[in-house]
Amino acid sequence: TRSSRAGLQFPVGRVHRLLRK
């Protein structure tokens, strides 16, 4: 998925998820 690919390219998805929480 696009999210998985973006997370691998840069720790943005993981950080975003933590911030959203």
Swiss-Prot record:
Q: Name one GO molecular function term.
A: protein heterodimerization activity
Q: In what tissue types does this protein appear? A: Expressed by the skin glands.
Keywords on this record?
A: Amphibian defense peptide, Antibiotic, Antimicrobial, Fungicide, Hydroxylation, Immunity, Innate immunity, Lipid-binding, Secreted
Q: Which domain of life is it from?
A: Eukaryota
Q: Which GO terms describe its biological process?
A: defense response to bacterium; defense response to fungus; innate immune response; killing of cells of another organism
For whether the record's keyword set contains Coiled coil, the answer is no
Cellular compartments per GO CC:
extracellular region
**N6-(2-hydroxyisobutyryl)lysine modified-residue sites:** 21
Localized where? Secreted
The similarity annotation says: Belongs to the histone H2A family.
**What is recorded about the protein's domains?**
Adopts a distorted helix spanning from residues Gly-7 to Pro-11 and a regular alpha-helix from Val-12 to Arg-20 in membrane mimetic environment, and a random structure in water.
Q: What is the role of this chain? A: Antimicrobial peptide with potent activity against some Gram-positive and Gram-negative bacteria. Does not permeabilize membrane, but internalizes into bacterial cells and alter specific gene expression involved in bacterial resistance mechanisms. Has the ability to agglutinate E.coli, and lipid vesicles. Shows a weak hemolytic activity, and is not cytotoxic to monocytes.
Q: What is this protein called?
A: Buforin-2
